[in-house]
Amino acid sequence: MKTQGAIIRQVPGRYETAELELDEAGPGELTVKMVASGLCHTDDHVATGDMEYGIYPVCGGHEGAGVVVQVGEAVRGWSEGDHVVFSFLPACGKCRWCARGMQNLCDRGAGLMNGSRLDDPTSFRMRLDGQPVGQMFGISTFSQYTTVDVDNAVKVPVDAPLESLCLLGCGVGTGWGSAVNLADIYPGDTVIVMGVGGIGINAVQGAVHSGAGQVIAVDPVAFKREKAMEFGATHVVENIEEGAELARTFTNGQGADATIVTVGVTTPEHVSQAFSSIRKAGTVVVTGVGDITRTDLSLSIGELTVFQKRLQGSLFGASNPTADIPWLVDLYTRGQLKLDELITHRYTLDQVAQGYEDMHAGKNIRGIVVYDA
C-alpha cells in the first residue's frame, strides 16, 4: 500500500516527505492509520547523526497513536477499529527481562536500530523507489499508515483522545518513570530535574506524584521554566549551579535527594554536575541521550564509595509498557496526569522539519503531528 512519510535520506539531514510503499500486516503484525505522533528529540538525533541509524533513508517517528486497520495472521486480542498507542520498545512477555518485570529491556529490542523487522535484519516493511527504508525503532509514526510488530502495540480505550495519548509511548513514560520508578523519591524529598523539555517536564510530574516536597526545574529557556511551574515545579533556575545551591539551602547543606538528567543532548559534564548536586546516598538518574561514543565521564570514586551515591541509567524510565501505558491513561482520565497541556504546537506531516526547528528554538515542550481523520 502507498503512504506518505517523513524521511531522512542521509546524515546530517532534514526531514522531507516522500511517497513510500508499505507492507500490509503480516503474521504477528498490525497495520495502523495514524492519528497523531509526537516530535521526540530522539528522531532529531537520527537526523543530526548524534544517534546514527542502521539504514538510511529512515522514516522517522516512534511516539504515536492511531487506529488499527488490518490485523495480521496469528495476532490474538486485536480487531480492526481498536485504538493503539505504540511503545517504542517491544515487550514479548517471554524473555528473561519481561518475566522479571523489566519489559523496557526486552530482548526483542536488540534490533531496534536496524530499521527492519525485529527478528530479521534483512526484512523491511517500507520502500522508496524499490529500495528499503528503515522504520524508526520498527515503528515510523511520521507516516500516514504504518505496520508494526504487535509487541510494540498497547490497546487503549476508544473514548480517550489519541492526540494526547500519542505522547505516552516515549516522552511521558520516560520522564514519569525516571522519577517514579528510578529516582527513589520519598515524600518531602528535594528533587532536581535538569532540562524540562518533553521528557523533563514529565519527570517533574512524576516527582510531584511521588510526593517530593521541593522540585527544582533547571533550564536556560525562560518559556520552559514557566511551563515547569505549571506542571508542579516549586522552583525554577537557569543552571545546575543555582539548582544545586538551592537544594543545599533546603537540606541543611546536604544536597538534593535525587537529580534527574533529562537534557536534550546530554554530555558527561551534565552527569558530573548532577553527581555533585546530590547528598550522601542520593541518586542521579541519567535519562538524556547524547554522543554515545563518549567514554570520558569524570566522577569522584571517593564520593561514589564513601558517600554511597548512586548513578542510575534510565531506558524508558524502567516502564513496563503493557501495564504502565494503561495506568497512565487512567491517571490522565482522572485528572492526575497532564497530557493536553504538554502539546505546545500542532503540525502537519510536511512540517516535521519546522517542528524540530521550533524545538531547537525553545518554542516547544512537545510538538505533535496531527493526521487527517
Question: What is each of the regions a protein language model found here?
Answer:
Residues 88-151:
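Cysteine-cluster motifs in flexible loop/terminal segments that predominantly coordinate metals
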